[in-house]
């Protein structure tokens, strides 16, 4: 899961100022993509110039392209974002339909306000998609943050000790076409209980991460 987040507790004034919009990808116009691309460059840039490179021009996605986005706005424009894509993954060879979450970011000037808590706005949309599970991956260092965001509310289960194989978003002459990462897996039980998530330590995306 491409992710740029704040780690502090949310202030009530910050929460009430954001207006959320759920947008299907076909609903976005060129101006929307341009605004989102600028938002992602500013959000991911502080984490490293390489992380901001995918958003050059008007490109508003980094790897796989989302089909649904939750976008938070305030008077200054885009404030926060999370994307969603339905796809099949393999868990130790078992096919599973999931709604993958990614492109998770908060505007840099709001770091310290914890507006990332408002990403829970996506959960009702997840429940309406008819998929068994929501799925995402984050760095292990973000375990405490994700536990505060979704784990304590019972929205998701966090799993460690899992390796995820993905393709690069493009073909690079100096890189392997496959990425293998040791990550923290975030699972949202939707149509099926968490006990029906397949056991396994290898997840294959067979495509780039969201």
UniProtKB/Swiss-Prot annotation:
<keyword id="KW-0012">Acyltransferase</keyword>
<protein>
    <recommendedName>
        <fullName>Nodulation protein A</fullName>
        <ecNumber>2.3.1.-</ecNumber>
    </recommendedName>
</protein>
<dbReference type="InterPro" id="IPR003484">
    <property type="entry name" value="NodA"/>
</dbReference>
<keyword id="KW-0963">Cytoplasm</keyword>
<comment type="function">
    <text>N-acyltransferase required for nodulation. Acts in the production of a small, heat-stable compound (Nod) that stimulates mitosis in various plant protoplasts.</text>
</comment>
<dbReference type="GO" id="GO:0005829">
    <property type="term" value="C:cytosol"/>
</dbReference>
<dbReference type="GO" id="GO:0016746">
    <property type="term" value="F:acyltransferase activity"/>
</dbReference>
<dbReference type="InterPro" id="IPR020567">
    <property type="entry name" value="Nodulation_prot_NodA_CS"/>
</dbReference>
<keyword id="KW-0808">Transferase</keyword>
<comment type="similarity">
    <text>Belongs to the NodA family.</text>
</comment>
<dbReference type="Pfam" id="PF02474">
    <property type="entry name" value="NodA"/>
</dbReference>
<keyword id="KW-0536">Nodulation</keyword>
């Amino acid at each position: 899961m491409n992710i740029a987040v704040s780690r502090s507790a949310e202030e009530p004034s910050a929460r009430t100022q954001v207006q959320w919009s759920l947008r299907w990808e076909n609903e976005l116009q060129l101006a929307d993509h341009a605004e989102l691309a600028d938002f992602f460059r500013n959000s991911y840039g502080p984490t490293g110039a390489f992380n901001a490179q995918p958003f050059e021009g008007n490109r508003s996605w980094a790897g796989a392209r989302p089909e649904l986005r939750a976008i938070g706005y305030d008077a200054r424009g885009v404030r926060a974002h999370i994307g969603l894509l339905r796809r099949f993954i393999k868990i130790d060879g078992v096919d599973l339909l999931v709604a993958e979450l990614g492109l998770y970011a908060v505007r840099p000037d709001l770091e310290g306000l914890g507006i990332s808590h408002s990403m829970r706005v996506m959960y009702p949309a997840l429940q309406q998609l008819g998929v068994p599970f929501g799925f995402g991956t984050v760095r292990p260092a973000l375990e405490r943050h994700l536990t505060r965001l979704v784990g304590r509310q019972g929205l998701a289960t966090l799993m460690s000790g899992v390796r995820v194989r993905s393709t690069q978003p493009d073909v690079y002459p100096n890189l392997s076409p496959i990425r293998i990462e040791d990550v923290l897996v975030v699972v949202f039980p939707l149509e099926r209980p968490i006990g029906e998530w397949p056991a396994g330590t290898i997840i294959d995306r067979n495509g780039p991460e969201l």
